[in-house]
Amino acid sequence: YIQHELGFSHLGIADDEFGTADGLAYLPYHREGRRLDGVIRLTLDDVADRYGRPSALYRTGISVGDYPVDHHHDCRPQIGKIPFPPVPSFSVPMGVMIPAGTDNLVVSDKAISVSNLINGSTRLQPVVLLTGQAAGTLAAIAAREGCTPREVPVRRLQAALLAQDAYIAPLYDVKPDDPDFAMLQR
């Protein structure tokens, strides 16, 4: 389709990646795929300097990530090691799950609205699971209250997630059974 219908005849499957006759992996797996154009697009800059950014996305956190950027360039050793900035623990903002131009849809997993670089930190299972929990909770609140997901106030979603003992801010030294957990997570 991409080559014939869209006219990108120069695009195709890499023939030097997997060593198979058809160029496909032995087992199907998507490390990266299409990502949402969301209300918010989380970038490496947002995470590396979360408190110094004017957007203050950390205030709209609905899940937590704690993994460095890891991009693999095994096919192109000439690129060498890329010095990505260290990534502190971070919050994933609510807007990455909400499409910019579509109502009544919530996206989670690896398709959230993130840049290619920070995708290396958000694609891990702990982030995917927490974001999935937030997406399901957001959809349930919207359905129960008769509104679209984008109309649900972030504080309403955060309160529901905190009632489920979810982490929405990267404060790992305060456990859910701590009396101050919910207050510190806000």
What are these regions (language model features)?
Residues 1-163:
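Flavin (FAD/FMN)-binding glycine-rich loop and adjacent Rossmann-like elements that form
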Residues 162-186:
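N-terminal propeptides
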